[in-house]
Structures are given as C-alpha cells and as structure tokens.
Amino acid sequence: NTSPKKSDCIVVAGGDGFMLNILKRFYMIKKPFYGINCGTFGFLMNKFTFTDIERKISKAKKTLINPLELIAIDKNNKRKKLIAINEVSLFRESKQTALIRLKVGKKIIMKKLIGDGVLISTPAGSTAYNLSVHGPILSLNSGKLAITPISPFRPRRWKGKIISNNMRVKINNLDTLKRPIAAVADNMEVRNVKSLIIKINKNIKLVLLHDRDRSLVKKIKIEQLRKNIK
C-alpha cells in the first residue's frame, strides 16, 4: 500500500494486455515489474497466487527488455511518438490492400509490398502476433528484430526479414489517398499514417521479474520447441 515511486517493485495482477499498459505507464520510474496472471494466457505473467509474494519476488529472475520506439506521421503531418513492448503493426484501414515501402537503415528492402500490412516484432513479442502470422521466434538475447508481412499479395512468397536491433526501420505509405493504413504499437493506434520510423530505444530499460521455473527465456524456448515439432 504505497505509491509506485516509493515501492521496491510494482506487482501487476491481470493479463498480458494490462501488463503492457502498466509497463508503458510506469516505466519512467525505473522499478521492476512482477506480474500475477489473472487473465487468459499470461505469457508475461507468473502463475496466479497471492501467497509468499515477497519471497517469490526476492528470488525471481530478472529479464531486461528494451521497447520499440515508434514515430508516426499522419496525412496531416501530425507526429505521434509511442513505445511498443511486443510489436508495431501496420494494417490497411479499408477494403483496399496496403501499398507500402520498407527501408532498413539506408537500404530499401522492399520497394512495393502489397498486402494487409506488416509488423516489426521484438524478441519478447515474437511468440505473440508475430508467430500467428508465421514470423520467426527470436531468442531474448538475439539482438534481433523480426519484420513479418501480414497476408502478403505481392510479392506473395516474401516471408519477411530478421534484422539487427541496431537498425532503424522506415515505412512509407505509397498511396495515402486510396489505401489508408493504421499503425498499432501493442494496443495504441494511429490512423491515416503517411510514414513510420521504428527503432529500439535502448535508453528505456524494462525489468520483468519471473519465477525461476517460468522465466521469459524458458517460455520462449518452449514455444520454439512447439513450433519445431509442428
């Protein structure tokens, strides 16, 4: 029963979505976060219990996460800055497919991508929406990001790209008038986007605490094994 600033640790009771909201709301006070799963899946959380919490927190394994930083410019040239722990997704807003250009660093890796959209995932988010659209699972310490197309129409067989997390990704909407697109940073949306710049913000360090038998590293390895078995 104390304020987040005066606490040693922030205990979050809820699901993954609630945890993402709390991380974004309180990351600037630089406290570790211990999640208790009261939701459905709870990938970022620990097993539901309210007994022996202090002991579990003291013995918990720390995981350091750097989020993505998104700068979106809409068709009216308004800028919006957001962070994403899992992924930044780009979606078509209408019946028309999205028509976008992808640039990594100084190199254009895709002059024209036609499809429902594209997403850029962190290792922590690579087992979430990224995996559902057949993206790769990334190890937490890989130092990589995944660029994964969403229902690509042209080029139909493009599976995406794994890049260094030191690289900056720029995405341009090539037809803002007929093919509007929206950008989503985890669960925060910007509509009518003209261009995006996405990069890892290494100045923001999020510390998640997990019980040693359910660490984030172990959970990701389990998902990798499941994917390989399939």
Positions of predicted regions on the chain:
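A glycine- and small-aliphatic-rich helix-loop capping segment at beta-alpha/alpha-beta transitions
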Residues: 26-31, 49-53, 134-143
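Glycine-rich phosphate/dinucleotide-binding loop and adjoining beta-alpha-beta core of small-molecule
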Residues: 16-35, 44-47
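Catalytic core of DAGKc-family lipid kinases
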Residues: 40-117
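Gly/Ser/Thr-rich active-site loops/lids in small-molecule metabolic enzymes
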Residues: 112-113, 119-156
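Short acidic low-complexity segments
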Residues: 1-8
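ATP/nucleoside-binding phosphotransfer catalytic cores, i.e., glycine-rich phosphate-binding loops
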Residues: 82, 90-91, 107-109, 158-230
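Short glycine-rich anion-binding loops that position phosphate/pyrophosphate groups of nucleotides
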Residues: 15-18, 39-41, 124-127
